[in-house]
């Protein structure tokens, strides 16, 4: 596994103040297996933050995802200062079905309160580019093949301050959201299958897609075809952990998306 390369050019346009952060006191460990000695530590931090909100996968799910390295690259990155927790994130890189771009699903990102507003968050948003490039190399992609980072984010509400802070941070960094007035993206139902069946069937949840199209951050529209590729990649990442019937829900059908030639606005995430 390659070492992480901290290249300032990988930082999002609005994250360049992160260049001044001294990273030398920090250790960045990449985790690619549930058998990694650091997995339980990293997973524990993520579960404590996101598990109670039903926003974190079970160990068994992640173990299966780790084992699909030939199809997708899932990893965690744990950041520590000596033995002190500083940050942790996880993400998955996968090639689009047509091979035109590497797509990285940004899953979870947790920075300790003492490390916030130091510039570290900017690097945590940029680190998945290393995984994307490894994915491109693994699939022998042509030089210059595009990379897109994509996150599923809840819609902004006035009563959820932490959500608004998170959206504002991505907005300042230069991420944009695909206009939800035209693209109605839904995340599959993550509940236990027994619970899904007891409740009468899956209930996909609405999310907005927030993206960083690396090298194209200045563009303010995205095509229907590219939008569909992004959503398909997310569903391809999820598919091994879901029953086919649950993924066949009408709200997850990509036929609902705008036609390939349509141009969809890229908006500020808080809008």
Predicted regions located by residue number:
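Alpha-helix boundary/capping detector
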Residues: 72, 132, 196-197
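Short, well-structured alpha-helical interface segments that form or flank functional binding sites
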Residues: 37, 101, 119, 123, ...
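Polar/charged side chains located within well-ordered beta-strands of beta-rich proteins
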Residues: 75, 89, 109, 125-128, ...
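A conserved beta-strand-loop-helix scaffold within acyl/acetyltransferase catalytic domains
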Residues: 28, 32-33, 39-113, 135
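Amphipathic alpha-helical segments that form well-ordered structural scaffolds
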Residues: 41, 45, 127, 168-172
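Short loop segments at secondary-structure junctions
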Residues: 82-83, 114-115, 213-217
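Terminal substrate-recognition subdomain of acyl/acetyltransferases
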Residues: 1-34, 140-271
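Conserved acetyl-CoA-binding loop-helix of GNAT-fold acetyltransferases
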Residues: 111, 116-139
């Amino acid at each position: 596994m390659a070492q992480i390369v901290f290249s300032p050019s990988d930082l999002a346009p609005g994250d360049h103040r992160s260049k001044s952060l001294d990273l030398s006191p920090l250790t960045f460990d990449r985790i690619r297996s549930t058998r990694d000695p650091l997995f339980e530590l990293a997973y524990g931090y993520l579960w404590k933050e996101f598990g109670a909100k039903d926003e974190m996968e079970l160990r068994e799910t992640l173990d299966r995802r780790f084992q699909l390295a030939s199809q997708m690259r899932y990893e965690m990155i744990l950041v520590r200062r000596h033995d002190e927790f500083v940050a942790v994130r996880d993400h998955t890189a996968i090639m689009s079905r047509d091979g035109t771009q590497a797509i990285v699903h940004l899953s979870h990102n947790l920075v300790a309160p003492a490390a916030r507003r130091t510039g570290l968050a900017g690097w945590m948003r940029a680190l998945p580019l290393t995984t994307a490039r490894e994915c491109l190399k693994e699939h022998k992609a042509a030089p210059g093949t595009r990379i897109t980072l994509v996150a599923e984010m809840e819609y902004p509400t006035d009563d959820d301050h932490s959500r608004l802070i998170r959206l504002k941070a991505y907005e300042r960094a230069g991420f944009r959201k695909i206009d939800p007035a035209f693209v109605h993206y839904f995340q599959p139902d993550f509940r236990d299958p027994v619970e899904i069946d007891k409740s009468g069937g899956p209930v996909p949840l609405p999310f907005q897609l927030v993206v960083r199209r690396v090298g194209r951050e200045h563009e303010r529209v995205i095509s229907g075809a590219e939008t569909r590729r992004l959503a398909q990649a997310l569903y391809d990442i999820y598919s091994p952990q879901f029953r086919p019937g649950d993924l066949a829900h009408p709200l997850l059908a990509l036929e609902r998306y705008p036609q390939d030639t349509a141009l969809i606005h890229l908006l500020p995430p808080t809008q």
